[in-house]
Each structure stands twice: as C-alpha cells, then as structure tokens.
C-alpha cells in the first residue's frame, strides 16, 4: 500500500467510526420510538430532528471553514494562526448558540410553520424541540473543536468523543424511556446530556493533547478586523450553500409529512440508509479535506492531485459495498427499526431509491471534502444552487402526479447534479493548477 493511501486511511478510518455513530444515534432513537406503539412517535422525532439538523447545518461553517483554514495554516507552518483559528471558531460558536437560546420561541414557531406536521405529530414534536434546544451551545462548540481537530490531521479524538456520546445517549435514552416510562421526552433528554458530555470531553482532550500549542497564542491577533473578515468571507459561501441544503432537506421532510404519518415514517427510515452511507463517505471526504488543505497550503499541487485520485478510488469501493449490502439486506434492516407493519410494508416500495444513493452521491460527497480543504467555497455554493433548482423543479412538476416516488427521484437527481457541477469546477481549479 502506498504511503499516501496509508495517510488517507489513518484519517478516514477513525472518521468513519466517528461519523457512523451519527446515523447509529438516529437509528437507536428510531428503534426506541419505533416500538412505542404509534407512527406519530417516529414522526415527532423525525420532525424535531430535522429542525435541529436545519439549525445546525446552517452553522456548519463552524466545522468546515475551521477545518479548511486550519489545514492550510498547518501546511504553511503558521502555528500562531492555527491557534487563533480555534479561538475564533469557539467564540463565534458561543455567540451563535446564545442567540439560538434567546430566540427559541420564534425559531420554533417558524420551523413548525414551515414543516407543517399533522395535528397528531405536533405536540410530541414540540416537546422534543424545547428540550433539545438546550444542547445547542454544546453542539456548535463541538463543531468548532471537530473542525480544528480535522484540520490538524487528527480524527482519533473526534472518534473517541463520538463513541462516548453515543454510549451516553443510548444509556440515558433507554434508562429514561424503559425505566422511568418517559416517551419522546426521554429520548430528547438523552440527546442533550450526550451533547454536553461530548463537548466537555472535547475540551478536556484539547487541553491534554495540545497544551504545548498554548505558547503560540497571541491575543492581539485573534480579533483583528482583517482576520475576522477573512474568517467570515471564507464561510459566507458555506453559509449560503448550507441554506440551500437545509431548504432541500426541509422540503423533503415536509413533503413526506403532508402525505401522512406512515409516509413520513417510511421516508425517515429510508433516510437512515442515506445518512449511513453519507457519514461513511464523509470519512474519506474528511481525509480529502485535511490532506488537500495541507498540500494546498504548502503549494504541493502534485501531492494534491494524487490525493484526490486516491480518495475517489477508496470512495468508489465503499459505494459498491453499500449498494450490494442495501440490495441484499435493506428490507431486513428496515424491519429491525420498527414493528409497525404498515410502515415496514410501505418501505419496501421505496427501497430501490435508497439503493441508488451510493453511486449517485459518490462524486458530491468526495468533492465536498476536497473543496472544503481548498476553501473553494464559491464552487460549493454553485453546486448546491444548481442541484437545488433541479430538486425543486422535479418536486413541483412531478410530485403532484407521482407522489413519494417523484420525491425520491428529485433527491437522487439532486445529489447527481451536485457531483457533476463540482467535477466541472474541479477540472478548472485542480487539474489546471
């Protein structure tokens, strides 16, 4: 195995373990609420989770921007800037999370107005929301920490944090639901406790592993106007890109919710397959962004191009593996998540769409990582603009006639267009560099 392949795996494998715990966390929550005795419990957690995904996705630049800029600064050996980037990211995360807590009531009103859940789902989703909102400071702070760790080529610490979070979440959720008889509230409290545990452990690991970096701390340079302008200019396109991403995901869930609790539950279960693949692929994307940013910062374009090729090769093998697994065992996997027979039966009809996701989304997932490392955020934004336009065009024209099948078609086309646009942009930025 080539040295660069080993470097990719050293970053990717801990990231895969770390990232796969995210959909596993959702799967555990779905498995718990899926056995509570009604599809409306699944729908409530689905709607509540989607709202928080939207909130956190909007501020995903705290991870992505920090990772790209940190890896480039590391490649330049600008260690004082590496430290300043961490402080900037955590400070911005704190300010944003405080704003979210202060505005939680209008945020809830707006989010649930846009999602339009059924009257059966709404009260349970509201309970979930007003508990989970208190995990926002921990989640956004952990975004900043994780991005910095990835930029430092260290994915082992995020892996440890994610595993610990899931152990805490599973233990707390099971304790509160099965021992204390709580329903959606128990799942929500378990999530918040796990989020804060993860952030606090992340700070402890930062002090333990990077205390020597403190000597590069230079307070006067942290909040210089030029530094903050660059920080936000790099993240501006990521922010706008994320709004497009949120709009697509929000509409997908909302369109499913408007078709009833069963279809919403079906789409939620199938999306777990989508998320499972995406988080595994993000492991290689993280390797791409960390290494691409480092080589780009060092001006080593030969190593950069070789890294891109090798990351795509590993990603292709993973896409093939997931396609085979979903074809052979997708139905059995869904049956493990719920004992609601109406949901299980309906899921079989739409499973083929989930099978298409691995190869349809391969290019989009890998290029996202590479472009984050290069901080080529404008291309990332344009890929989401074009793909979102394609998604909504299909939804508005075909969903009224073909229902949920058209909704899934729109999602598949959406990820394909993302990959195509980024491939064209990469040809201009990387191959001609």
Please annotate each region the language model reported:
Residues 42-102, 139-157, 266-328, 362-375, ...:
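Small-residue-rich hydrophobic transmembrane alpha-helices
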Residues 6, 21-22, 59, 100, ...:
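Alpha-helical transmembrane segments of multi-pass membrane transport proteins
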Residues 27-31, 144-148, 170-175, 203, ...:
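Alpha-helical transmembrane segments of multipass membrane proteins
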Residues 5-7, 11-12, 22, 41, ...:
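Hydrophobic alpha-helical transmembrane segments of integral membrane proteins
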Residues 10-29, 131, 142, 151, ...:
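Transmembrane helical elements of multi-pass membrane transporters/channels
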Residues 24-43, 112-119, 175-182, 239, ...:
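Helix-terminus/linker motif at the lipid-water interface of multi-pass membrane proteins
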Residues 1-15, 70-137, 179-239, 292-357, ...:
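Short alpha-helical transmembrane segments in multi-pass integral membrane proteins
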Residues 63, 131-151, 158-169, 187-202, ...:
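Short runs within selected transmembrane alpha-helices of multi-pass transporters and secretion channels
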